[in-house]
A protein has these predicted regions:
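Amphipathic, small/basic residue-rich leader segments at the start of a protein or domain
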Residues: 1-129, 147-150, 154-157
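A short, Trp-centered hydrophobic/proline-enriched beta-strand micro-motif
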Residues: 158-166
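Cytochrome P450 C-terminal beta-domain/meander region
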Residues: 84, 174-194
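A short core secondary-structure module
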Residues: 189-211
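Adenylate-forming
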Residues: 137-139, 165, 208-211
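Short, solvent-exposed loop/turn elements at beta->coil junctions and helix N-caps
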Residues: 98, 167-171, 198-199
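N-terminal glycine-rich flavin-associated loop
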Residues: 124-146, 172-175, 184
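Short glycine/proline-enriched turns and hinge-like loops at secondary-structure junctions
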Residues: 104-105, 174-176, 202-207
């Protein structure tokens, strides 16, 4: 293989059509995938390298010096750092631009999340992952237009924190065995939730809850 062909192959980036993933649930865990959707450091684009550098600088200069204080359940410090991450665009990397995000790919989002971990704060990374993943993605993928416009811009900026309520006392984390119900109000304007949820990451601080 010639050098030019090698370089071309290394610099190739692959895009994932997330529309095709809707409705598949956890099928991605057991369905074989081709090498085309696997990324390596050698395939990072210039934009991805830029985000990697910015995230590393934030991790080293902002998160690391206060990491031990964050681990001591310091709400104000955690929320302040969380909002700084939003201002830098780290919370809305793969959220569509029309809803306040950057509209980039999941690979870039993963790179940023990975590099921010160098800051040494496990709890902050869990807070971020729950917010950008299981709290934001359900609205992005399955929310109606009103919900997307109302919540996603503020979740991308860090103004709102999100959480995902799954686990129940009697069902554990088995979503199909959950007993919580949503009943439409008599006037048809809102839903009334009846049930119990426990062990909700970000649950004490979040303003947006997906369940």
């Amino acid at each position: 293989m010639s050098e030019s062909n090698t370089v071309k192959k290394i610099n190739t980036t692959f895009e994932i059509d997330y529309e095709k993933l809707k409705g598949r649930g956890g099928a991605f865990l057991i369905v074989p995938i081709g090498k085309g959707v696997i990324f390596t450091r050698e395939k990072f684009s210039e934009d991805q390298k830029m985000f990697e550098s910015a995230a590393l600088e934030f991790a080293q200069k902002t998160i690391y010096p206060i990491s031990q204080d964050i681990e001591k359940y310091n709400k104000n410090l955690t929320m302040d750092t969380f909002r700084q991450m939003g201002e830098l665009g780290f919370l809305g990397i793969d959220t569509p631009e029309e809803y306040g995000g950057l509209g980039l790919d999941k690979t870039t989002s993963c790179i940023v999340c990975d590099v921010l971990a160098y800051g040494g704060s496990v709890s902050l990374m869990v807070t971020m992952a729950a917010h950008t993943g299981i709290a934001t993605l359900p609205i992005t993928w399955y929310g109606n237009e009103f919900q997307k416009k109302k919540y996603l811009p503020k979740m991308s900026s860090g103004e709102l924190m999100g959480c995902y309520a799954l686990t129940e006392p009697s069902a554990g984390s088995d979503a199909l065995s959950g007993q919580m119900k949503a009943d439409l109000s008599d006037d048809g304007k809102y839903y009334i939730l009846n049930g119990q949820k426990i062990y909700i990451t970000n649950g004490s601080w979040a303003e947006v809850c997906v369940t």
